[in-house]
């Protein structure tokens, strides 16, 4: 694919010389920093820094090419992932239309070994494409190197697809919200595409897929968008974005491998512009929902404030603890030194401090005072006014004698304010009044803890401030506003540190029964009712588990099924007790019958009365079947007596055997108990009675 055709012959010249792309500072590294202004022109210099920079060439003052190149190289070389290139798209302004767009800031290309080892096509079209790419690369090298480069210097190596995509990117720009970088800047959210480049709704992503790229990342920063590309599929992890931000900001681990720049502290304003600091929202017109403003006359046109930042959110920046402004007696420091002081103070405070310190500040004179923004109680920025007690600032400042915030030139926001002029006696009286107000408000805060909770939304910690030693007198009410602010701050601190919360008095225990579960105090009726219902539900769950047949799942049906089951169990218990009593009565009658029977005669009689001696009976029972073995003398037909006894005992015979050995007869019978069931002892006793006593057997 040839994205750099010969039809547009002026693209190269427009790319290198156009003022519409100010984000391409090839010589920004060699440009010396501007000399510091003289001290007596401090007001004019500060006004120039407040106004927005010209749209034609903001890049020369906003970037240092060497530092930006180091940032991009640290990402490529220091990441665990394999990135092919890194491009920083800088935010700029189109001079013709005035719209914001993203243009080429700088880039770093590493390449891919697999791309170089890939076999190239030997077709004439591929060869012509390579010649075209080499010619464009030679022109770029000659333009960058200047007059010292040889005109006939040739590019020996082939220009790979990814390298060509990187070169073509130099001529591209993206309006806000269009293209992958423009969408990332507009949404203020990182974009990570790892598997869907071919189907992404962006021409640049589809072109990247055509040239062999598989992963693209666009990360919005303060003044532009950082784009990364790779020929590998790299998925996003939880720490990918923070690591890339740390490498781009030249963290301690990444910056230790680079030699320090000789003028890094003075000639590198990208420390303030490129560092991805916490976002701020600084606007010219402050909404009434955030800060209540008394209605003063509008400020002069030359005092209009301009704040520039890449992203917007609420006030989350923390300015330096002591904010100073040079006075006529104090010469203004050079901008380079002021910038170093501001960077050191920001490094000490840390980038994520969310406090806003407005306790002590000074201002210089020489012009009319801008309006003083006095916050009301209960709003977003609470400066310590107690809304619970209905008090207001006892000394409101008039519009003509008010003070506001000032910072050193070159910081993120600045404002011209008059000098606070106060005589020595006025300062002494104001200090006494300040201490008295702090004491009275501290005692009032202890009586109103709700006010302290309302005022604790933002912490305005007090910090030491270097005040000018000389100057003209200022109205006492302006100093009174400062003292009132400090007093309210000390009031919050004293209420938190000095006055501990009183111990909660123990309520007397009520007389009555001791609370359950070892509780010290009885519960209220709501808690007791809740526990009673939980206990009742647990009982119903246990009852449902033991009832076998549950018709419905509601509590009424469960109770009815439980009652029916209990009645059924009670009926079974009654029937079993009746059967037990019947069996016990039968056993008693059998015992009485056996005891009442007359003893057998000792002597033998005739054939029917002769006793069969030496009778051995053995019965074994297995379930409803019994095996009977009888051994006796063969006289008096013992086999007939055995069959008669079995008939009387209602035993069914399904196997019988009789054998005679001399005078002994051995009988083995297998019977089945059909109607009555005997135990082994009962069967032995019944057979012995009927076989051993012939008289009983004959009956």
UniProtKB/Swiss-Prot annotation:
CDD domains: bHLH_AtAIB_like. Belongs to the bHLH protein family. One of its GO terms (cellular component) is nucleus. This is Transcription factor MYC2. It holds the Pfam family bHLH-TF_ACT-like_plant. It comes from the Eukaryota. One of its GO terms (biological process) is regulation of DNA-templated transcription. Residues 520-533 are annotated as: Basic motif. It comes from Oryza sativa subsp. japonica. Residues 335-349, 387-412 have a biased composition (Low complexity). The gene is MYC2. Residues 306-321, 413-449, 459-472 have a biased composition (Polar residues). Interacts with TIFY3/JAZ1. Residues 534-569 are annotated as: Helix-loop-helix motif.
């Amino acid at each position: 694919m040839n994205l750099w055709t010969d039809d547009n012959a002026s693209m190269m010249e427009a790319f290198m010389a156009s003022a519409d792309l100010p984000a391409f500072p090839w010589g920004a590294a060699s440009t010396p920093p501007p000399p510091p202004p003289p001290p007596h022109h401090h007001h004019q210099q500060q006004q120039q820094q407040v106004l927005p920079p010209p749209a034609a060439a903001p890049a020369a003052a906003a970037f240092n090419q060497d530092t930006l190149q180091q940032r991009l190289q640290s990402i490529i070389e220091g990441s665990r992932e394999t990135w092919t290139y890194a491009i920083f798209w800088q935010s700029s302004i189109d001079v013709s239309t005035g719209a914001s767009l993203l243009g080429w800031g700088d880039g770093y290309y590493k390449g891919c070994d697999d791309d170089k080892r890939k076999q190239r096509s030997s077709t004439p079209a591929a060869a012509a494409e390579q010649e075209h790419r080499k010619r464009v690369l030679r022109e770029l090298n000659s333009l960058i190197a200047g007059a010292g480069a040889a005109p006939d210097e040739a590019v020996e190596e082939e220009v790979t697809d990814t390298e060509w995509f990187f070169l073509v990117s130099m001529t591209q720009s993206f309006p806000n919200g269009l293209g992958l970088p423009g969408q990332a800047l507009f949404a203020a959210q990182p974009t990570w595409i790892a598997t869907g480049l071919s189907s992404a709704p962006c021409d640049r992503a589809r072109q990247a897929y055509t040239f062999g790229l598989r992963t693209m990342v666009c990360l919005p920063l303060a003044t532009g968008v950082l784009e990364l590309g790779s020929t590998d599929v790299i998925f996003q992890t939880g720490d990918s974005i923070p690591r890339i931000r740390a490498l781009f900001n030249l963290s301690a681990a990444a910056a230790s491998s680079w030699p320090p720049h000789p003028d890094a502290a003075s000639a590198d304003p990208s420390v303030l512009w490129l560092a991805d600091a916490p976002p701020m929202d600084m606007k010219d017109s402050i909404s009434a929902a955030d800060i209540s403003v008394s209605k003063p006359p509008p400020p002069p046109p030359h005092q209009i404030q301009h704040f520039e930042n890449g992203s917007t959110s609420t006030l989350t920046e923390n300015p330096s603890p002591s904010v100073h402004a040079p006075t006529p007696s104090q010469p203004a420091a050079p901008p380079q030194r002021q910038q170093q002081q501001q960077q050191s103070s920001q490094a000490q405070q840390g980038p994520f401090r969310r406090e806003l310190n407005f306790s002590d500040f000074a201002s210089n004179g020489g012009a009319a005072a801008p309006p003083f923004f006095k916050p009301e109680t209960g709003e977003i920025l609470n400066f310590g006014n107690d809304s619970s007690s209905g008090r207001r600032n006892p000394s409101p400042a008039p519009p003509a004698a008010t003070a506001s915030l000032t910072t050193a030139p070159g910081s993120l926001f600045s404002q011209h304010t008059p000098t606070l002029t106060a005589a020595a006696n006025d300062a002494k009286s104001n200090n006494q009044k300040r201490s008295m107000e702090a004491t009275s408000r501290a005692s009032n805060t202890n009586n109103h803890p709700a006010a302290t909770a309302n005022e604790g939304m933002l912490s305005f910690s007090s910090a030491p401030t270097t005040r000018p030693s000389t100057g003209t007198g200022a109205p006492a009410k302006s100093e009174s506003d400062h003292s009132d602010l400090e007093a309210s701050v000390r009031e919050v601190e004293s209420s938190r540190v000095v006055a501990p919360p009183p111990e909660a008095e123990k309520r007397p225990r009520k007389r009555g029964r001791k609370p359950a579960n070892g509780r010290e105090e009885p519960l209220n009726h709501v808690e007791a009712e809740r526990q009673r219902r939980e206990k009742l539900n647990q009982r119903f769950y246990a009852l449902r588990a033991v009832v076998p047949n549950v018709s419905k799942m509601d509590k009424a049906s469960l109770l009815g099924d439980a009652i029916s089951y209990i009645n059924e169990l009670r009926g079974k218990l009654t029937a079993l007790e009746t059967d037990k009593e019947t069996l016990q009565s039968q056993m008693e009658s059998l015992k009485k019958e056996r005891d009442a029977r007359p003893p057998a005669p000792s002597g033998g009689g005739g054939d029917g009365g002769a006793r069969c001696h030496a009778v051995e009976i053995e019965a074994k029972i297995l379930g409803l079947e019994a095996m009977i073995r009888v051994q006796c003398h063969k006289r008096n037909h013992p086999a007939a007596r055995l069959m008669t006894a079995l008939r009387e005992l209602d035993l069914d015979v399904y196997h019988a055997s009789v054998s005679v050995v001399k005078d002994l007869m051995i009988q083995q019978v297998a019977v089945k108990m059909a109607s009555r069931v005997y135990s082994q002892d009962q069967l032995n006793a019944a057979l012995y009675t009927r076989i051993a006593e012939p008289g009983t057997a004959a009956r």
